[in-house]
Regions:
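C-terminal basic regulatory modules in eukaryotic proteins
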Residues: 137-149
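Glycine-anchored, exposed beta-strand/edge motif detector
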Residues: 1-53, 147-242
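Extended, beta-strand-rich, solvent-exposed assembly scaffolds of outer structural proteins
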Residues: 59-136, 197-203
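Autoprocessing Asn-cyclization modules and mimics
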Residues: 21-24, 28, 53-71
Length: 242
């Protein structure tokens, strides 16, 4: 197949470098499986790569819940901790923090103090995503009482690596050194329903795919092709990272 020609019929390959343009490539170990042609992110400690800009921090605001005898259920990564309010928010927060630290693996909870009294601060121990739901007195209040954030930082795009097909694996595996393109031309994986035009801005989503949508995403370069077929149902485009 003609990977460097017009790809009207042929398939491109995710993570394949393109042409003789100047390139900047660095090497960083993988914390988890990393897919070719997707953006990668440095974890909170900046020591390894993860495959998404995960919401690894969260704040749960319970400060308004001072009425006694109301049920609070906080679910974190499918594990639920509960408390029936006592009328003293500090007591209820302390109980929830204790239960979270005992029962929810890989998550550390701390109680807010001073101006943050009545809040619970959550952190993923390994920079992975926090999936949180908060129910108060039978009502889902997640949207109004839970805020999430990410310490993960965009690093570049995972380069195709032939040796990673050992034992039929088509990814970088945990602890393997990942070749990461910071600057240059590379075939990338598109987000769903994205059809870029040449020289339109290329943005990275939190999932590591590429889009033309700016809202909530990271500008990393320009598209240099339209949508092309990858393997299976995967859709790709050529991007110039800058």
């Amino acid at each position: 197949m003609n990977l460097y020609g017009m790809l009207d019929a042929e398939k491109a390959m995710a993570g394949l470098l393109y042409g003789m343009n100047p390139k900047t490539i660095v090497s960083v170990p993988a914390q988890e499986e990393i897919n070719f042609g997707k953006a990668v992110f440095l974890n909170e400690s900046k020591t390894a790569l993860v495959g998404g800009k995960y919401n690894n921090k969260a704040t749960v605001d319970l400060s308004a819940y001072t009425t006694a005898s109301k049920d609070i259920a906080l679910t974190i990564n499918s594990v639920t901790v509960t408390v029936t309010t006592s009328g003293t928010i500090a007591t209820d927060v302390a109980a929830l923090v204790s239960d979270i630290n005992d029962d929810v693996d890989g998550v550390t909870a701390t109680a807010g103090t001073g101006g943050n009294a009545g809040k619970i601060f959550l952190a993923s121990d390994d920079s992975t995503n926090l999936d949180i739901e908060l129910v108060y007195d039978g009502s889902d209040v997640t949207d109004s009482k839970v805020t999430t954030s990410s310490d993960c930082v965009y690093a570049g795009v995972a380069v195709f690596h032939q040796n990673a097909f050992l034992n039929s694996r088509g990814v970088y595996v945990p602890t393997e050194t990942v070749n990461v393109m910071e600057k240059g031309y590379i075939w990338v994986v598109l987000a769903s329903d994205v059809t870029p035009s040449v020289d339109s801005n290329a943005y990275v989503t939190a999932a590591g795919t590429f889009t033309t949508e700016s809202s909530g995403n990271t500008l990393v370069g320009k598209f240099k092709s339209g949508k092309e077929n990858g393997t299976g149902t995967e859709k790709l485009a050529l991007v110039a990272l800058d």
